[in-house]
Structure formats: structure tokens, C-alpha cells
């Protein structure tokens, strides 16, 4: 009897690019020896739209609708970083009420982003039920966004010196109700997921990153805090009014996929604490700095004449960016979102460099998946939490 020879050739598998509704149009070229991963090469750029170059030909107000297309699941953070840069360049003060509204919107957006991470992450490792559960809270969140901003996604709500509109009547009470309801939902998630033995088998000890290794790779956000590094820009930089609230930085020591899950679950609870404190202490006053209009560099054009007074198309306000350099950053759900801005005494930025957290966090993926099983790739990739809109820009 002839015994068939065993093939020992390596196999190359293409994973992706997938539809943007999942992790995005990311392609992985995976080299396998049986079920063992030998090498992994991420292929990026399918969603590249030239966002940095577009910024050099737009005023800040004109560019605001573009930035919501970076991380389209956490658009408040991209808006915040866009208006914070000219505010610091021009030393523009933000009213206290506007700062509180910003914090509330940012933390609601953080919860929405973590929910949209949790559902697909659980679906990746074979648990379908949480994927449907998270849409209950997501719909309530988007109802709050729609009532305040007019849009469920791509809100275009932040403005230089404040926000576009004040909170509508009854919105604060609705937000209080959501906070109380959501805390019970987090308890349900922990009962359903955290103590599940099958879930623990899939994530515990998978994709371990040490603290020093995380720093050397430039990781940030939950990827960094899950490796034992207590670093949160809301505590470090104290931007907006975060230093007025009582909350704790969520972190873990082990650095595996389970730790990254626990950090994000804990962050959702802490975000609720921040929102509740902000709702209770929100002051009165203006929601925008009206003095900002003095900085408008738009020339008096024919659009302001009597014949055009009933035409809605008007030149957008523009602000001159002084000739200096500035780096601004915020703690986004996926890590440190930063902008390096160079002004040139013009209404257009001379350089607008984006520091996306997902792009930098993704660089460690090939190292994490080596010598792991093929099924572990989706677990590790899901625990990183990437959105290709901000990775490719």
C-alpha cells in the first residue's frame, strides 16, 4: 500500500479586503504552515482619500465636514481636534457651558465607538448574540445625537469657540435616563461575556504586549493601558474640563486580548460617570464665543449686497492661522488622535499632519500573530480596534 506523501509547502492566504462595515477594507497576506501563522503582511491604502492635502486647500470651517470621515464611528473626536488647533493658535477662549457640552458629546461618542467595537469583536470570535444586543444602546445614543446635532452620524457639531447649537429642551433629562439604563446594560454584558468560559479560552493569553514593548511601538489608548501603562490624555493634558470630574483611568497588567476587552468595558462605565457629573454641574451662559466673529478674515464681497440677501449660499467664515507650529492631541476611543498644524499667516493651513491612533496601533499586528493559530488572527485584529477611514485617511 502506497502511503500518500505529506505536503510541507507553505500556504499563502489572502484575508480581505472586506466591506467597510466590518473592520474596513484591510487586506492581510498570511503565510501559513498548516494552522500556524508564519508571517502576516497588512496591505493598506484602499480607503485613502488625501485628507491631509484637502486640508491645505480649505479653511477650518470648510474642512470640518471632511474630518468626520476619518473615524466615522467616533466623529466628535475628529471635530474636537480640528477646532482645538485654531483655538490654541488664536488663544480663543471657550465658554464653560460649551466646554461641558463638548465633554458630554465626547464621552457619548466614546461609548458609541466602544459599543461598535464590542459587537463585531464578539462576532469575530463566534458569539453572535452580543452583536445584536449592542444595537439597543446604540440606537438610544444616536437618538440623543440626532436631537442635539440633527445628525445620527457625521454630526458637524463643534465650532471654533464653542458648539453649533445649545442643547434642546428636555435633552439633559433624556441623557440622564440613558445613563441609568446603560449601566444595567454593562452589567448584562459582563454576565453574558466576561465570565463565559468559551470567550475566555479565545482571548486569554492571546496577543500579549508588554508595557515596554507597547511604548516602543508608540501604542496608545486601550492598547497601551491594557499593558500596564496608566496613560490617559484626559488626565495628562487636562483639556476641556476633564479635571473638574472624578473618574479613574482604566488599565490592566496582562496585555492580552482579554485585558484590552476589560479596559474598554471599564471605560464605558467611567464615561457614564463623567457624563452624569457634567449633566449635574453644567453651567448656564453662552454655548459659543461670539468674540470669535471678530477674527473672521472673509472680505466683504458681492454676496453681502442687497440683491443676494435671500440667497443661502454665503462665504464660510475663515480665520487667519498665524505663522507658527502646533501639535494638538485628544484621547480618542482608539488612542491618541493628534494634529500637527503649521500656519503661514493665511486662512489655509500650510501643513496639516494627522496622527491617527489606529494606523500606529495596527503596525504591531504582524508581530502579534506570528506563531499563533489562524483563528487567532481575527481575535487579535478585533482587540486592536481599527477603522480604516482613519488608518488610510
UniProtKB/Swiss-Prot annotation:
Position of the signal peptide: none
InterPro entries attached to this UniProt entry: NADH_Q_OxRdtase_suD (IPR001135), NADH_UbQ_OxRdtase_49kDa_CS (IPR014029), NDH1_su_D/H (IPR022885), NiFe-Hase_large (IPR029014)
Top-level taxon of origin: Eukaryota
Keyword Thylakoid: yes
Keywords: Chloroplast, Membrane, NAD, NADP, Plastid, Plastoquinone, Quinone, Thylakoid, Translocase, Transport
Catalytic activity line of the entry: a plastoquinone + NADH + (n+1) H(+)(in) = a plastoquinol + NAD(+) + n H(+)(out); a plastoquinone + NADPH + (n+1) H(+)(in) = a plastoquinol + NADP(+) + n H(+)(out)
Main location: plastid
E.C. number(s) listed in UniProt: 7.1.1.-
UniProt subcellular location: Plastid, Chloroplast thylakoid membrane
GO biological process: photosynthesis, light reaction
GO annotations of cellular component type: chloroplast thylakoid membrane
Molecular function GO terms recorded: NAD binding; oxidoreductase activity, acting on NAD(P)H, quinone or similar compound as acceptor; quinone binding
Keyword Cell cycle appears in the UniProt entry: no
Membrane-topology annotation of the record: Peripheral membrane protein
Job of this protein: NDH shuttles electrons from NAD(P)H:plastoquinone, via FMN and iron-sulfur (Fe-S) centers, to quinones in the photosynthetic chain and possibly in a chloroplast respiratory chain. The immediate electron acceptor for the enzyme in this species is believed to be plastoquinone. Couples the redox reaction to proton translocation, and thus conserves the redox energy in a proton gradient.
Family affiliation: Belongs to the complex I 49 kDa subunit family.
Assembly and oligomerization: NDH is composed of at least 16 different subunits, 5 of which are encoded in the nucleus.
Protein name: NAD(P)H-quinone oxidoreductase subunit H, chloroplastic
Amino acid at each position: 500500500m502506497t502511503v500518500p506523501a505529506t505536503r510541507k509547502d507553505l500556504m499563502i492566504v489572502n484575508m480581505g479586503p472586506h466591506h467597510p462595515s466590518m473592520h474596513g477594507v484591510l487586506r492581510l497576506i498570511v503565510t501559513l504552515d498548516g494552522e500556524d501563522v508564519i508571517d502576516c503582511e497588512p496591505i493598506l491604502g484602499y480607503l485613502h482619500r488625501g485628507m491631509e492635502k484637502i486640508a491645505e486647500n480649505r479653511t477650518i470651517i470648510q474642512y470640518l465636514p471632511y474630518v468626520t470621515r476619518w473615524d466615522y464611528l467616533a466623529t466628535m473626536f475628529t471635530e474636537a481636534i480640528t477646532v482645538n488647533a485654531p483655538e490654541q493658535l488664536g488663544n480663543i477662549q471657550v465658554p464653560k457651558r460649551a466646554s461641558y457640552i463638548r465633554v458630554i458629546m465626547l464621552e457619548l461618542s466614546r461609548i458609541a465607538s466602544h459599543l461598535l467595537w464590542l459587537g463585531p469583536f464578539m462576532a469575530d470570535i463566534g458569539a453572535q448574540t452580543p452583536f445584536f444586543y449592542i444595537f439597543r444602546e446604540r440606537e438610544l445614543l444616536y437618538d440623543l445625537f440626532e436631537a442635539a446635532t440633527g445628525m445620527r452620524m457625521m454630526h458637524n457639531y463643534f465650532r471654533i469657540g464653542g458648539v453649533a447649537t445649545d442643547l434642546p429642551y428636555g435633552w439633559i433629562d433624556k441623557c440622564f435616563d440613558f445613563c441609568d439604563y446603560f449601566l444595567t446594560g454593562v452589567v448584562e454584558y459582563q454576565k453574558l461575556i466576561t465570565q463565559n468560559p468559551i470567550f475566555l479560552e479565545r482571548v486569554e493569553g492571546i496577543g500579549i504586549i508588554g508595557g515596554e514593548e507597547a511604548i516602543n511601538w508608540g501604542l496608545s489608548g486601550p492598547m497601551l493601558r491594557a499593558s500596564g501603562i496608566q496613560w490617559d490624555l484626559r488626565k495628562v493634558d487636562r483639556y476641556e474640563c476633564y479635571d473638574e470630574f472624578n473618574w479613574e483611568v482604566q488599565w490592566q497588567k496582562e496585555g492580552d486580548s482579554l485585558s484590552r476587552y476589560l479596559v474598554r468595558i471599564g471605560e464605558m462605565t467611567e464615561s457614564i460617570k463623567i457624563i452624569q457629573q457634567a449633566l449635574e454641574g453644567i453651567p448656564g451662559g453662552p454655548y459659543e464665543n461670539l468674540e470669535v466673529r471678530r477674527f473672521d478674515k472673509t472680505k466683504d464681497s458681492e454676496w453681502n449686497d442687497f440683491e443676494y440677501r435671500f440667497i443661502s449660499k454665503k462665504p464660510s467664515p475663515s480665520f487667519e492661522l498665524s505663522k507658527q507650529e502646533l501639535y494638538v492631541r485628544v484621547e480618542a476611543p482608539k488612542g491618541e488622535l493628534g494634529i500637527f498644524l503649521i500656519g503661514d499667516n493665511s486662512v489655509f493651513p500650510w501643513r496639516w499632519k494627522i496622527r491617527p491612533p489606529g494606523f500606529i496601533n495596527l503596525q504591531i499586528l504582524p508581530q502579534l500573530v506570528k506563531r499563533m493559530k489562524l483563528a487567532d488572527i481575527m481575535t487579535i485584529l478585533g482587540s486592536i480596534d481599527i477603522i480604516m477611514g482613519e488608518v488610510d485617511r
